[in-house]
Every structure is written in structure tokens, then in C-alpha cells.
Design a protein with these regions (language model features):
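Active-site-proximal, substrate-binding regions of enzyme catalytic domains
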Residues: 2-97, 103, 110-114, 153-166
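Acidic, PIN/NYN-like endoribonuclease modules and their adjacent C-terminal/linker elements
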Residues: 46, 106-166
Length: 166
């Protein structure tokens, strides 16, 4: 199983939906930069915080800081701190997949040639391998209760790809 580097939105979303364990089933280790950890756990009661703490205590989620490099400084000028650290760490560990939802972060990852997926990608994979019976209820929960943003076109495409009715 591969190791992944996660940005905050994936941990928050999957944690809030009670699906953070999907990451444990797919990846040997989830690496989280300090700025991402702070974002996920800062409020203490933020959706996904308790689940992230549990994953860290179980040892499959680990904190890992990127090196302080000119690249990190450059990324911090255009992205939030968590995304910048996640992308910088991904350049240090090119065998790792990046978990990332933010459009600006994904665009930068594309430009840098980094492999990534996001919350929706994890849910679709879980459905495909039988670890999640349906994507729609989880996606609806994220959109309705946890401010997960997904446009109508993408929402419909995801459900089609999952073989689920609108």
C-alpha cells in the first residue's frame, strides 16, 4: 500500500462523514504537514478533528514537515499554508500521492507534475472496491452539512461514475 500526503479538506470531509477509515484501508500511511494538522484540529470541535486525532493515535496518520526551501516560500505566496506545505512535501516524496480538493492547489499540483486525488476520488474508489455501498449519501451529507463545495455538473458526473441515480 502506498503512502499519501493529505491536505486538510480531505481529512475534514472524510472525518466529518465518518469515513476517515477509508484512508487507512487504502494507504499504508497518511502524512500530514504541520499547517494542515493545525487547520484540521485548530477548533478542537471542528468536523473531522476527533477522527484525525484517533488516526494519529493509531499511528497510521503521521505529522511530517516539509523542508524550509525556496519552493515552500514561493508556494506560501499563492496558496494557503496547508496546501503549500502539502505540495512542498510531495516534491520531497515523489512516490507519494497527494490528497487535495482545493482548485488552486490542484492546478498548482498539475503544473508541478504531482499525482493527486481528492475526497470524491477516495469515495469513488471505496465504492468501486466494495468498501462503501453508495457515494451519494456521503456526498450529500458533506454538501448539506459540512459546506463541501461541488458543482452540479461534477456532482452528477460523480454519481454517474458511481452508477448511482440522481
Amino acid at each position: 500500500m502506498p503512502t499519501v500526503i493529505s491536505d486538510a479538506s480531505v481529512l475534514i470531509g472524510l472525518g466529518a462523514a465518518g469515513q476517515i477509515e477509508l484512508l487507512r484501508g487504502f494507504y499504508a500511511q497518511v502524512l500530514v504537514p504541520p499547517a494542515v494538522w493545525a487547520e484540521v484540529t485548530s477548533a478542537g470541535t471542528r468536523p473531522g478533528a476527533a477522527e484525525a486525532h484517533a488516526a494519529k493515535n493509531q499511528g497510521w496518520l503521521q505529522l511530517r514537515a516539509p523542508a524550509a526551501t525556496p519552493l515552500l516560500a514561493h508556494l506560501r505566496r499563492t496558496l494557503d499554508a496547508g496546501e503549500a506545505e502539502a505540495l512542498a512535501l510531495a516534491t520531497e516524496l515523489p512516490e507519494c500521492l497527494l490528497l487535495l480538493d482545493d482548485a488552486d492547489g490542484r492546478e498548482t499540483a498539475l503544473q508541478m507534475g504531482l499525482d493527486f486525488t481528492g475526497t470524491v476520488g477516495v469515495l469513488l474508489r471505496a465504492k468501486r472496491v466494495g468498501r462503501l455501498p453508495a457515494v451519494k449519501p456521503v456526498l450529500d451529507q458533506l454538501v448539506q452539512h459540512h459546506r463541501f463545495r461541488v458543482g452540479r455538473t461534477l456532482y452528477e458526473a460523480v454519481l454517474r461514475q458511481a452508477g448511482e441515480a440522481l
